[in-house]
Curated annotation (Swiss-Prot):
It comes from Shewanella baltica (strain OS185). Mg(2+) binds at S102, D241, D243, D245. SUPFAM superfamilies: Phosphoglucomutase, C-terminal domain, Phosphoglucomutase, first 3 domains. InterPro entries: A-D-PHexomutase_a/b/a-I, A-D-PHexomutase_a/b/a-I/II/III, A-D-PHexomutase_a/b/a-II, A-D-PHexomutase_a/b/a-III, A-D-PHexomutase_C, A-D-PHexomutase_C_sf, A-D-PHexomutase_CS, Alpha-D-phosphohexomutase_SF. The modification Phosphoserine is found at S102. PROSITE patterns: PGM_PMM (PS00710). This is Phosphoglucosamine mutase 1. GO terms for molecular function: magnesium ion binding; phosphoglucosamine mutase activity; phosphomannomutase activity. Keywords: Isomerase, Magnesium, Metal-binding, Phosphoprotein. Its cofactor is Mg(2+). It comes from the Bacteria. Catalyzes the conversion of glucosamine-6-phosphate to glucosamine-1-phosphate. It is an enzyme of class 5 (isomerase).
Length: 445
């Protein structure tokens, strides 16, 4: 396949005002996408965004470009990424566009597309859009310009969709839940969803100002929610990231429940109800504890490359339904076409209600093994992973760890780094093993 110049694994992303994230490129991108998408279908595109101050600028630029290509545009305003995917499907739109840099700071932003079925845009369509980007922008004739409207009830539609994933015979009455919205796109959605299902909700990270998204709150900064759960004597906490496609949880003891543990809960619940199709897809970074816990239940487990795009690809290849990353991207293809933090939280709460169990009880049978990650910087064009010395160190550690441990060495795709990850039963031993391999990498760098 031809190498993509603009689109990465998750659309276009970068620092606002530099590189590709400029209003000029957004205008041209809207036009180029409109040219490709207008060849068939409804000629209707939905645009949603998170709460970054730059979102308004990019929304206007994309809107102008799409209209210039003859496509009608429907604006959602600040809404979670999975809400854009959902409403793209329900409105039978030709595509959905999300303006977000997910868990990144406010000064970054990004643009990604969903296809008409709510899944990530096909690689070939992205290549076609890139080809159009190389051409001069030519506006359609005035009578063919696209119209722009606003989806006034987008919030209500998505709230009802989320609630529809919770079993009608149960409620959340009696549960006190802390919900951290990361000052992001779920700020006006997530607290309402859990309140309407009956929970007492304490919302934090729900006051966006355009520049505080993901700032010391949310799924990538768990300190605040852990403190709040303990201070409020809450039953659990739910932390979302800036665009709402990622979730981490906290039990009543203030302990973090990560994506691997959430996958375990969902797989156990599906198996107990006889609806688990196949097994579970994790990634190369998934904790060995998840693998071992699923083995004990005779649930197959497979690993993809890191990234929810690759988890989705492997799920489709295996025809399985549940997969995700330890960072909190959770996919359940029986409940959506993309990662959805709110829905994943609802599914965990549904498992708690069905089994009349706490979050601690649902994760008690899964032992998270100590995991150490060491980053080693190297210089030059050579690949330290091809060194005999590094290979020998890895083989030695793997032999000593046996079946209760794991070693993963990989090169960073963005920096001159070798990432050394070691898992095992004993933290001090794991740390020593990781440093042994790291020293071998340093010696040949």
């Amino acid at each position: 396949m031809k190498e993509r110049k603009f689109f990465g694994t998750d659309g276009i992303r970068g620092k606002v005002g530099s590189g590709q994230m400029t209003p000029e490129l957004a205008l041209k991108l809207g036009w180029a996408a409109g040219r490709v998408l207008s060849r068939s279908g409804t000629k209707k595109v939905i645009i949603g965004k998170d709460t970054r101050i730059s979102g308004y600028m990019f929304e206007s630029a994309l809107e102008a470009g799409l209209s210039a290509a003859g496509l009608n545009v429907m604006l959602m305003g600040p809404m979670p990424t999975p809400a854009v995917a959902y409403l793209t499907r329900t409105f039978r739109a030709e595509a959905g566009v999300v303006i977000s840099a997910s868990h990144n700071p406010y000064y970054d932003n990004g643009i990604k597309f969903f296809s008409t079925d709510g899944s990530k845009l096909d690689d070939n369509l992205e290549l076609e859009i890139e080809a159009e980007l190389e051409k001069p922008l030519v506006c359609v004739e005035s009578h063919l310009l696209g119209k722009v409207s606003r989806i006034e009830d987008a919030r209500g539609r998505y709230i009802e969709y989320c609630k529809g994933n919770f079993p009608a015979e149960h409620t959340l009455t009696g549960l006190k839940i802390v919900v951290d919205c990361a000052h992001g796109a779920t700020y006006h959605i997530a607290p309402a969803v859990f309140r309407e299902l009956g929970a007492e909700v304490i919302a934090i990270g729900d006051k966006p100002n355009g520049m505080n998204i993901n700032d010391k709150v949310g799924a990538t900064s768990m300190g605040k929610i852990c403190e709040t759960v303990l201070a409020e004597n809450a039953d659990l906490g739910i932390a979302l990231d800036g665009d709402g496609d990622r979730i981490m949880m906290v039990n009543s003891k203030g302990e973090v429940i990560d994506g691997d543990q959430i996958l375990y809960i969902l797989a156990c619940d599906a198996k107990s109800r006889g609806v688990l199709r196949g097994g579970v897809v994790g990634t190369l970074m998934s904790n060995l504890g998840l693998d071992l816990a699923l083995q004990a239940l005779d649930i197959p487990f497979a690993r993809s490359k890191v990234g929810d795009r690759y988890v989705m690809e492997l799920l489709k290849e295996l025809d399985w339904r549940i997969g995700g990353e330890n960072s909190g991207h959770i996919l359940n293809l029986d409940h959506g076409t993309t990662g959805d933090g709110i829905v994943a939280g609802i599914l965990v709460l549904a498992a708690m209600r069905r089994q009349n169990a706490t979050l601690e009880e649902l994760t008690s049978a899964m032992e998270m093994l100590p995991q150490v990650l060491v980053n080693v910087r190297f210089e030059g064009e050579h690949d330290p992973l091809k060194s005999d010395k590094v290979k020998a160190a890895q083989a030695q550690v793997e032999s000593e760890l046996g079946v209760r441990g794991r070693v993963l060495l990989r090169k960073s795709g963005t920096e001159p780094l070798i990432r050394v990850m070691v898992e095992g039963d004993d933290h001090s031993a794991v740390l020593a093993h990781a440093n042994l391999i790291a020293d071998a990498v340093k010696s040949v760098s």
